[in-house]
Amino acid sequence: ERYTQTAELINSERSNEMTDSTVIMILSESFSDPTRVSGISFSEDPMPAIRSVKNTTTSGLMVSPAYGGGTANIEFQALTGLSMALYDPTLSSAYQQLVPNMDNPFSFNQLWDSKQGDGSVAFHPYNRNMYFRDRNYKSFGFNRFYALDGEDQMTDLAKIDAAWYASDESTYCNVLDYLSETDDTEQFVQVVTMQNHMPYDSWYQNNQFIDGDTSVDLTDDERV
């Protein structure tokens, strides 16, 4: 009730709603701002493109509740607003243990579904059944899910140099192609990338930050 009253007060002078536009939520695998790590300095900005976007629009920070694995748990928390800290520690994977057993799982994209109809789409350049994403996205109300396999497949996915997974750029191109081909200007698009998924090694040529590698003394097990 307290939050409802606060929301009503904030929205009382607003004429537009978020669901009147297309919102793209990107969870970029392993992405963080390295300039925020203490004890590390850079001769140039490692993320100039993102920084330029942040400097010209509304932006902020999101604190990740985990690192080193469990990508789908971060995704679950971002989509539902539910913290894994609220559950028993034996719950190691919400997508595999919790969501399949929920009668009506709530997720953020449903705000568009309820107002615009079938208004949410998901993209993930990997196998659709990983972490039960295919069935969970359906439970969340996504009407289409583009992945490596299945009925709706992503196309022209490319890798960078020796990297194992599809590049973020080619993933985003799939999203842009989809948006250019649809007349729907009021929808929610969920994007989960794969480019920087583990394992971590010297995949990229001409990496100007290689001299700052802090993993040279790690064992093979620690790298994984």
Language-model-derived ranges and their functions:
Residues 4-20, 25-28, 33-224:
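Solvent-exposed soluble domains appended to multi-pass membrane proteins
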